[in-house]
Regions:
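PRPP-associated nucleotide enzymes
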Residues: 1-121, 129-216
Length: 216
């Protein structure tokens, strides 16, 4: 089994990724979703944590061999960046969602030298907004952002297009398609549910996948 499927199975087993097409979740945006992702749970599950953090480190070594610093996104990416940086023997810092309103008013925490080659560690990619905000802050500070390593991506068209437009490369450990198929294989959902999850990924604002469920 490759790492993409190993991570998918691990996330499902600890319910960091939860599939519930029969009872959709409601996101803050109001979108009805058959999937919910909380990668913070990885930190509470030692076996899953070991798998994921080693996979992040291996991905950095393989995809971004010139990396000099890892930068986590606040707050969810911080712990993952810290553990992976420890495994790699690299410096680590993180990017706040906004500058502090006291002290040195830092947006970027940790030492960053202009020109350093940085890899951003993110837990989840949906529309790409938060990670692109972090990349922008790092670029403004003079960093050369090599790309992103994320634990999970929904693979939404908007997110893919926004990353491409900003010339930001993202490598995810696993994705919605893999999780959906692994979910069916492991008995979490049915084969019919896989199609509903993929329909959701294609157009999250179109709730016809829910109607398809009720008609099935």
């Amino acid at each position: 089994m490759d790492i993409k499927h190993e991570v998918a199975r691990s996330l499902l087993s600890i319910e960091a990724v939860f599939l519930r097409p029969q009872e959709p979740f409601t996101w803050a945006s109001g979108i009805k979703s058959p999937i919910y992702c909380d990668n913070r749970l990885i930190l509470t599950a030692p076996e899953a944590r070991d798998l994921v953090e080693r996979a992040i480190a291996e991905t950095v070594k393989r995809e971004y061999p010139q990396a000099q610093v890892l930068m986590g996104t606040a707050t969810a990416g911080i712990a993952h960046a810290a553990i992976a940086a420890h495994l790699l023997g690299l410096p680590m810092g993180y990017v706040r969602s906004s500058s502090k309103d006291h002290g040195r008013q830092n947006r970027i925490e940790g030492k960053l030298v202009p020109g350093q080659k940085v890899v951003v560690v993110e837990d989840l990619i949906s529309t790409g907004g938060s990670v692109l905000d972090a990349v922008d802050a790092l670029r403004e500070a003079g960093a050369e952002v090599l790309g992103v390593v994320s634990i999970f991506t929904y693979g939404m068209k908007r997110g893919v297009e926004r990353l491409a437009a900003a010339q930001v490369r993202n490598v995810s450990l696993t994705d919605l398609d893999t999780v959906a198929r692994m979910g069916a294989q492991e008995g979490y959902i049915t084969e019919a549910d896989v199609a509903r999850l993929l329909a959701f990924r294609e157009n999250p604002s179109d709730e016809s996948w829910i109607q398809a469920e009720s008609q099935a």
